């Protein structure tokens, strides 16, 4: 696999209480999905935009990461 290992981490809102829409990669569906981030903590599977998430983690059918 060409995608970074952190793409396989679960969505993690972190320990703070903000309400920030973010995106994470879901390996089961090979798609980037929205979740609510608390603003601190969490993990690296956390992207500001769906495009950034796709560029980093979503594999194309040809086997490499898909370009945005």
From Swiss-Prot:
Disulfide bonds join 7-57, 16-40, 32-53. Gene3D superfamilies: Pancreatic trypsin inhibitor Kunitz domain. Pfam families: Kunitz_BPTI (PF00014). It comes from the Eukaryota. PROSITE patterns: BPTI_KUNITZ_1 (PS00280), BPTI_KUNITZ_2 (PS50279). GO terms for molecular function: potassium channel regulator activity; serine-type endopeptidase inhibitor activity; toxin activity. PANTHER family: BPTI_KUNITZ INHIBITOR DOMAIN-CONTAINING PROTEIN, KUNITZ-TYPE PROTEASE INHIBITOR-RELATED. Serine protease inhibitor that weakly inhibits trypsin (Ki=0.2 uM). May have potassium channel blocking activities. This is Kunitz-type serine protease inhibitor PPTI. It comes from Pseudocerastes persicus.
């Amino acid at each position: 696999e060409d995608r970074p290992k952190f793409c396989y981490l679960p969505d993690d809102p972190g320990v703070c209480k903000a309400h920030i829409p973010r995106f994470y990669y879901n390996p089961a569906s090979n798609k980037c999905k929205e979740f609510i981030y608390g603003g601190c903590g969490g993990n690296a599977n956390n992207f500001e935009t769906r495009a950034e998430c796709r560029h980093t983690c979503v594999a194309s059918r040809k086997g490499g990461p898909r370009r945005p």
